[in-house]
UniProtKB/Swiss-Prot annotation:
The protein's name: Calmodulin regulator protein PCP4
Basic and acidic residues: bias regions: 12-28
Outcome of substituting P37G: Loss of the calmodulin modulator function
General function of this protein: Functions as a modulator of calcium-binding by calmodulin. Thereby, regulates calmodulin activity and the different processes it controls. For instance, may play a role in neuronal differentiation through activation of calmodulin-dependent kinase signaling pathways.
Species whose genome carries this gene: Homo sapiens
Annotated region (Acidic), positions in chain: 28-40
Assembly and oligomerization: Binds to both calcium-free and calcium-bound calmodulin. The affinity for the calcium-bound form is 50-fold greater.
Amino acid sequence: MSERQGAGATNGKDKTSGENDGQKKVQEEFDIDMDAPETERAAVAIQSQFRKFQKKKAGSQS
């Protein structure tokens, strides 16, 4: 349930910066090969760090 709250907070931030989306989309388009081994390794590393963060966050709130 706390994951949904985190996603809601992120969506709230996106709404405030949504005014300049038309200009930013042109600059932020990237062609990322999702099947590349280095992309998969990066995704695993990011997910691992996120899980550690969530575990630490859950432990400190109790």
